[in-house]
Amino acid sequence: MPSCLSCLVPGQTRRRDEDDGSKKILETPLHPDAVVPPDNVSAGEFIFEILRAKPTHVGQIDSLTDAEDTYGQMLERSVRTALWLRSRGIESGDVVALCTHNHFDTVTPILASLYCGSTAAPWDPGMNCQEIKHMVRISRPRYVFCNEESACTVLVALKECKNDAEVVVFGYHSGCASFADILKPFTAEEIDEFECSKIDERSEVALIVCSSGSTGLPKGVEHTHRTIMIQFGIVKLLNLRNRTSAVFSSLYWISGVMGVLVCIAGDMRKVIVPVVDEDICARVIEKYRITWALMGTSVLVRLIYSGALEKYDVSSLKTITGGGGVVSLEAFAKLRAILPNALITLGYGMTELGGAATFQLVECEQNSCGKPIYGVSCKILDTSTGGILGAGEVGEICWKSPCVMKGYRNNPEETADIIDAEGWLHSGDIGYYDKDGSIYIVDRSKEMIKCRGNQIAPAELEGIIARHPGVQDCAVVGKPDKIDVERPVAFVVRRGNSTTVTEDEIVQLVASQVSERKQLRGGVRFLDALPVSPSGKPKRAVLRNMLLKEI
């Protein structure tokens, strides 16, 4: 069986000399002993061989029922699903969408898609119809696997988009194929003789994962089979083989889908947690003696401050991997007091980078997000001149990585905006690195609000509020919050200074139009006028400062 699990190994970040003699580009090269992912092996072939080699290994445990799922069972169901897809005429490039909660078969259509050389597109089951319609337009799926709760919304969205994708339901829904039924028609001989499709693993798109756009609607980020294979290196990097794991993240996020696949690559026992709640998470860690937990930093911070980690015995945790936001020094200290011997790896990542770009493998400088992982380079650009800056100088952070996305799905313009001609990805984040190569984030040049691990675009909420007849002007910004990172707050100017528009009215208006994760959790503030720039744009920094004074 081919191995790529040591492509990320400990080593030394260095600064590369530029023409003027200064060392301005951070890079962490591959270790000489690293095993580079093999050519001509797809992620589907790699996972298929792992599952086939250990049929009795318990790969999944349902935390609700204690039921166990072996690699052999996972392989059979995923092969049966792949055979069904082939019987329906699936081809390379076809999209298999997934819209469901976490359960044994959440990963099955993804594995089947990888075997067939097609493209898997996980969607958030909490999306409303407008959001799913947007995903349909981006990914243009040929097949959609969804749970019973999402079926009606998915069917309406497909119909309104004039998309005739076949819908398969985990459970039952009138007019749709049942997942249990599509597994039945195939013989043991067909399963034994199954082979994965041969593809070009460097160019074929394996995943379309959502990333927030400046309008609030997500973009479809394309990643190849090669990206998945390289990300499997985290098993070696963090010594995760044969761990008992829990992925407290939806497959909608890059961390969730990569985390689930990494669990298979590392021969782990993954405990499935259908609902991410602080008390449930801590109870699962205690009951199943979880040794590796992967979660967004928003979940981690809520766990720390909820008291759940003290309520349950979580001493089994050897490694916690978190990303997607900042963990304050206060929160980190509380976590370290609870788990003094655990390896806490917090890092910086982007969906467009295929996951993590940095990791703190040791206690780095305070507030640092760590150093570039292997094969990743970083430079800081002056936001005015575009020139490369040195250590301690603040500018836009740019990245080069073997895991950088192929592009945004059906969106070459925005792809060209974020990846330049030399292959550098412009993150939109503002920061610097110190003399030791540790990277610090100081601001976001984007206006996105980060709340509970979700990216919320002010423009989307502002567009909804502005449609209220009693609203003359509005702006939405994030208010810093110890638990949620930020909470969206709407600043509203009433039309004609009318007093008839209430906070509850605005909050309910937004709630009726967007998903639960985009609510105005910070409330509404009424002003006589918004502070604006000479061009008429809201001065968001001024509004944020007003909120800071409330803290």
PLM feature spans:
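Conserved pre-ATP/AMP-binding loop-to-beta segment of ANL
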Residues: P55-T56, N102, V169, S174, ...
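AMP-binding/adenylate-forming catalytic core of the ANL superfamily
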Residues: M127, V144-C146, A293, S401, ...
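Conserved AMP-binding/adenylation subdomain of ANL enzymes
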Residues: M229-T244, Y252-W292, S306
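Gly/Ser/Thr-rich phosphate-binding loop
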Residues: A265, I290-M295, I304-Q366, S377
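Structural core segment of the AMP-binding/adenylate-forming
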Residues: P2-R16, S87-R88, Y115-P185, G496-T499
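Conserved AMP-binding A3 loop
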Residues: E68-G72, A206-F232
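Conserved AMP-binding/adenylate-forming core of the ANL superfamily
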Residues: V58-H103, V107-L111, N128-K133, R137
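AMP-binding/adenylate-forming catalytic domain of the ANL superfamily
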Residues: F170, S515-K537
